[in-house]
């Protein structure tokens, strides 16, 4: 029976190694930044930088209007950079609200490296505070897509924006991990990014858009978010739309334009 013990020991070792690898490389699995050269010139918009608490410079592309009534802050997904955000939000640049596209650390022309959930949230708050110096909160809309819905919902929970729009949101990164790696303990994750909890704590209206054909983040996660505050959360199903299609569907732009009226 010694062979049974050897097999069990080998499986246990493989399990420990799997957990160790996932812990060490989770940033690589979660974040897929596309960096841009320091001299890269965006084809549209006005570029500037904000400084994080530790002095790291974070890149912003803005579309400002002389008589803007408020501001829209867009937080993108786990891939790309502000360069991709330009076409994902193209229909919003002519609204009578300023539009701000924000790159996380290591994305686009932003400096630094993402190392913790608290850091992600704090950087997003720095950007929100920048807008709050120019506009009352009742005229600030936060919008997020995919990965960015975790930060957008956090800003909604910690502040009092006019509205929060979430395209293709996840219930949490922990829930996403459990879809495929349920055997790995939750404490391994440094980035739980609990959107459900954030939306439950928020006081502003929330609109969720989610493709019913999304085979990456299940539509059921949008229903979970709706369930935590059914009177305050609006869920807009997008029939036949997949994960990437949620941010490109005309319903996203229509929704944001509706909530700023």
Functional labels for PLM-detected ranges:
Residues 57-130, 134:
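Membrane-embedded segments
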Residues 202-203, 208-210, 214:
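Short beta-strand/loop motif that positions the catalytic acidic residue
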Residues 213-217, 243-244:
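Acidic catalytic loop of the alpha/beta-hydrolase fold
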Residues 136-146:
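Alpha/beta-hydrolase fold nucleophile elbow
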Residues 3, 7-51:
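An N-terminal hydrophobic leader/cap segment in hydrolases
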Residues 88, 195, 204, 218-227:
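Short alpha-helix in the alpha/beta-hydrolase fold that links the catalytic acid
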Residues 241-251:
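Catalytic histidine-centered segment of alpha/beta-hydrolase-like enzymes
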Residues 165-175, 195:
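Active-site nucleophile loop of the alpha/beta-hydrolase fold
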